[in-house]
Amino acid sequence: MKVLFVTTEMDDFVRVGGLAAVSAALPRALRPWSDVRIMLPGYRDVVEQFTHIEIVGQCAALAEMPACTLGRASTKDGLPVYVLLCPELYDRPGNPYGDESGRDWPDNDIRFGRFASAAAELAAGTLDKNWAADLVHANDWQAALTPAYLAWRQLRIPSILTIHNLAYQGLFPKDSLRRIGAPDSSFHIDGLEFYDKLSFLKGGLVYASHLTTVSATYAKEITTAELGCGLEGLLRVRSAAHQLTGILNGIDESWDPRHCAQLAQPFGAGDWKGKQANADYVRRQFGLAVSRGPIFGLVARLVHQKGVDLVLSAADEIIRDGGQIVVTGSGEPAIEDALVAAHRRVLDRGLAAAGHDDLSAVPDDFVGGRQHEVDALLMHEPRD
């Protein structure tokens, strides 16, 4: 089976949240049974990391979406990656979705409408004349319109949409419908319309052949009024039709601390000297005082939904009792500012921010204040 895995993040190239980890691990896990290929936007960080990108096709302009070029490359271990090359949309500073101050790019409808439209063309075999997909696997709102473009063009290619986080829906003004070349008939309650706005995610929920999410628990939670983010009615319909499945994320063995070259000292279960050596290294790297107390890790996108504010409210008590906290990630400017202020307040005694460094092997425990299950990755990362 030929599978096109459509994503806007992938570890080793560009990362904002857990989507990047899934996008790096799942296609590799599928390789023994399928010809799986990844499609990514041509962000600056992505393009710079490939030594060679072969041009395979051209996308014509559509509505307000510019023409673009499709390139093909491969990872170091031979996984094929298609890159959508359009510098005016993707060659920008900041992160994939916003500028350096954390504000969303105002043309994100164009940026990800262009991406989804091109993915549908690639799946149909009109961009790479030597390859077409038997199945399209789109991820989150940024790629969610891929099944919609397939349907609008009457392309009978089965599609899956995975919901990694229902709270992020890709909402835009109604006028975006025209900007991305979507048919007027799609703007209604059984289409892309969501409280008089256009919802990219809803488009995928409506048009994808099947929906999946990160666990069986989360699949149930998003059909409730409390956690359905206004989409619970549609999700209940898809669930009743057996078209919504929760699949628990599995363990990525590349995180095994016994064989990880990135650690200061590899270690396994019961090897507390090795564990301590890595903890001491992290303390030195981030200016924390030497201690034999526990390190608590917070590995998350720094947004309210992840409970970062609750961790901050407990930080003084944790530090007073001898613990230390290491935070990794980026996110809302207000929360980042609060972390900086907390760090200045306690100086080296117990709180450090570490950007996007992977520190899952170091903490003695993890903290977070999520009130519902939306992170099914961290709990499975092997750390001994």
Where do the protein language model's features map onto the residues?
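Alpha-helix boundary/capping motif
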Residues: 357-359, 365-366, 372-376, 381-382
